[in-house]
A protein has these predicted regions:
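Bacterial N-terminal signal peptides
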Residues: 1-8
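Mid-to-C-terminal functional-domain signal that highlights helix-capping/loop sites
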Residues: 15-216
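N-terminal signal peptide c-region/cleavage motif recognized by signal peptidases
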Residues: 10-12
Length: 216
């Protein structure tokens, strides 16, 4: 399979999340689902290390799911095996801030320009869900955001939207052929079992990703 058949590309170089009415935003805030996951239990990453393609190739297999974000300066690759444990990567490239986000329960990978009003917003996973999608929280203002739209629905930044960054969903084999000079998110230090997905496996039948049942 080629990158074009596997990738979901957001043509959103200058796109921004569509505003909602205050009534719609209030409805979101009233329908959040408690998951038992507390704020801080899923640690986000801040300006993590990256490997070159040839170094990352030693630990990634060609059929593994990876995500690509087109940041300033070029493509960056984010292995799903790492993103599932952290869900948010806060990055700064040439003084430009980005939030690289992944929600395993909806299977959405989104990247945003997170510079706003002179601030570089830093995001974490808040722990609750809306319609199975992760709720994000920024450390700067404490506002709550939808992961799949980049829209603030509660807090001082209510109604604000983050510009989207183009992303791809593909495999490691396709990614390294198409972007041979990309930087690849390196395995963080720590004892998390990065080779194991707590939600299942995209390549194996009968796991979470092959199940239409509502989990939350």
């Amino acid at each position: 399979l080629t990158l074009l058949t596997l990738a979901a590309l957001w043509n959103a170089n200058n796109a921004q999340a569509r505003p909602r009415s205050l009534q719609e935003l209030a409805a979101i805030n009233g329908k959040l689902i408690e998951t038992g996951v507390k704020y801080g239990s899923i640690p986000s990453l801040y300006r993590p290390r990256y490997d070159r393609i040839q170094d990352a190739n030693l630990s990634l297999s060609d059929d593994e799911v990876v995500f690509i974000a087109m940041l300033q300066g070029g493509a960056r690759v984010y292995p799903q095996r790492i993103m599932v444990w952290h869900q948010v990567v806060n990055e700064i490239v040439d003084d430009k801030a980005y939030a690289i986000t992944y929600c395993p329960t909806t299977g959405t990978f989104m990247a945003y320009d997170s510079s706003m009003g002179g601030l570089n917003l830093i995001f974490d996973t808040e722990g609750r869900l809306y319609d199975a999608n992760s709720v994000l929280i920024d450390r700067n203002s404490g506002s709550l955001w939808l992961q799949e739209t980049g829209m603030a629905f509660d807090g001082p930044l209510l109604g604000r939207g983050l510009p989207m960054v183009p992303v791809y969903w593909t495999t490691w084999g396709a990614a390294k052929r198409t972007f041979p000079h990309a930087l690849v998110l390196a395995k963080p230090n720590g004892n998390k079992p990065y080779g194991r997905d707590p939600y299942g496996n995209y390549l194996r039948k009968g796991t979470y990703y092959d199940n239409d049942r509502l989990i939350y």
